[in-house]
From Swiss-Prot:
Domain MTTase N-terminal: 3-120
Cofactor: [4Fe-4S] cluster
Disulfide-bond pairs as recorded: none
Cofactor note: Binds 2 [4Fe-4S] clusters. One cluster is coordinated with 3 cysteines and an exchangeable S-adenosyl-L-methionine.
Organism: Shewanella sp. (strain MR-4)
Function: Catalyzes the methylthiolation of N6-(dimethylallyl)adenosine (i(6)A), leading to the formation of 2-methylthio-N6-(dimethylallyl)adenosine (ms(2)i(6)A) at position 37 in tRNAs that read codons beginning with uridine.
Keyword annotations of the record: 4Fe-4S, Cytoplasm, Iron, Iron-sulfur, Metal-binding, S-adenosyl-L-methionine, Transferase, tRNA processing
Domain Radical SAM core intervals: 143-375
Protein's name according to its UniProt entry: tRNA-2-methylthio-N(6)-dimethylallyladenosine synthase
């Protein structure tokens, strides 16, 4: 009877990536297979996020539900990872006695060892340290699950925005060596991946070591990835405006594999609030980045993050945010009502904006961005869009689902053979959350460029010594 693993994930794409690596790790080294049903699992892992309001209480509520399963099965192992575990490890241990393992984002690679410690009778094994880049050296080779893949290129953040817990839960910025990233993407491309999304809390701050002792910038890494045959689309998230340098903007001018869509969080359009947030830039500097981006890539579309009701935010401050939204013409946003995060400098500020006022401002902001997004979508009517076919349509499994460069879902009638490849479709209808397309041509009728085959990169790295032990070298 196979051993079962259940993982519940909350939060950002980095957490989704980490959870997939936990599954790979425990599958590779201990033979666990994933299950959607917590009731049939031998191990339950909760990968937590501390960004949202009442994150800690949400964790304890979930653990309370899992405790009933452990009462029935004392051999069940329960682990808590992610940012809440990193921040509140001792509190979790003291309050939730059903928890066996507590680990941080940088120590998930030690899960097999921690599980063995529990099997030997140890109680509440905790490791929320920050061993920098060690975890990437201990993870199994990547496994593709469809034509798109996330690849983590760096961890942590050193910006210390006044509202944010990330530097305290994931540590400061640490970049992976560039050769390791290129090798991982080449391995994914060999398995059929066509689009990669490069991940980091502050991804454009990437400065990775090269094999010859140099430093690879984020702009250089983008060009290296674009040269890998089979990788025809590159996305990245999340960026910080103060690291969005001209060399990155230049990549948009000469690298078509980099999509015409960018998520660049700004949080507020008020210079006064941006200063209180310790963002390190003003609204005019943000608009300067967007202006230069649109000069390099005229059709690029921008999404952002907004925090509504930050301490001290006046109606005039909110009006500045709405003015920025109009000036930039954002296509999408993730917008939230401010709530204090324990341990951050902003938590000491008086939360003096009325909750009803916050809700009204949030509704106004979201309504405006929805209008702008629909305007962009309507402009796509009648155009031919190249989409990457990801699988069957969610609502109608007899149809296919793909995604445009500007991150819109398109449903269309097509043959299953197109899954995992690019097709051109004409946009024939527009909905709030998706588009309707008509199939025009398949990939066999396109002229997709070929530069550097993944097998060339793998061969370059792979070397067998006299004993037949495989090593990977630059």
């Amino acid at each position: 009877m196979s051993k079962k693993l259940h993982i519940k994930t909350w939060g950002c794409q980095m957490n989704e990536y980490d959870s997939s690596k936990m599954a790979d790790l425990l599958g590779e080294y201990q033979g666990y297979t994933l299950t959607e049903e917590a009731e049939e699992a031998d191990i339950l892992l909760l990968n937590t996020c501390s960004i949202r309001e009442k994150a800690q209480e949400k964790v304890f509520h979930q653990l309370g539900r899992w405790k009933t399963l452990k009462d029935k099965n004392p051999d069940l192992i329960i682990g808590v990872g992610g940012c809440v575990a990193s921040q509140e490890g001792k509190a979790i241990k003291d309050r939730a006695h059903c928890v066996d393992i507590i680990f941080g984002p940088q120590t998930l690679h030690r899960l097999p060892d921690m599980i063995e410690q529990v099997r030997r009778g140890e109680k509440a094994v905790i490791d929320v340290s920050f061993p920098e880049i060690e975890k990437f050296d201990r993870l199994p080779e990547p496994r593709a699950e469809g034509p798109t893949a996330f690849v983590s290129i760096m961890e942590g953040c050193s910006k210390y925005c006044s509202f944010c817990v990330v530097p305290y839960t994931r540590g400061e910025e640490v970049s992976r060596p560039s050769d390791d990233i290129i090798l991982e993407i080449a391995q994914l491309a060999e398995q059929g991946v066509r689009e990669v999304n490069l991940l980091g809390q502050n991804v454009n701050a990437y400065r990775g070591a090269t094999h010859d002792g140099g430093i690879c910038t984020f702009a250089e890494l983008l060009r290296y990835v674009a040269a890998i045959d089979g990788i025809d689309r590159i996305r990245f998230t999340t960026s910080h405006p103060i690291e969005f340098t001209q060399d990155i903007i230049d990549v948009y001018e000469d690298t078509p594999e980099l999509v015409s869509f960018l998520h660049l969080p700004v949080q507020s359009g008020s210079d006064r609030i941006l200063t209180a947030m310790k963002r390190g830039h003003m609204a005019i500097e943000y608009k300067s980045i967007i202006r230069r981006l649109r000069k390099a890539r005229p059709d690029i579309q921008i999404s952002s993050d907004f925090i509504i009701g930050f301490p001290g935010e006046t109606k005039e401050d909110f009006a500045d945010t709405m003015k920025l939204i109009e000036d930039v013409a954002f296509d999408h946003s993730f917008s939230f009502i401010y709530s204090a995060r324990p341990g951050t400098p902003a938590a000491d500020l008086p939360d003096d904006v009325d909750m009803e006022e916050k809700k009204q401002r949030l509704a106004i902001l979201q309504d405006r961005i929805t209008q702008q997004a629909m305007r962009y979508s309507r402009h796509m009517m009648g155009t031919v869009q190249r989409i990457l076919v990801e699988g069957p349509s969610v609502k109608n499994p007899m149809e296919l689902r793909g995604r445009t460069e500007n991150n819109r879902v398109v449903n269309f009638e097509g043959l299953p053979k197109h899954i995992g490849s690019f097709v051109d479709v004409e946009i024939v209808d527009v909905y709030t959350n998706s588009l309707r397309g008509k199939f025009i041509r398949g990939e066999d009728e396109m002229d997709l460029r070929r530069n550097l085959r993944p097998s060339d990169i793998l061969a370059k790295h792979k070397q067998d010594d006299d004993l037949g032990v495989t090593q990977f070298k630059p």
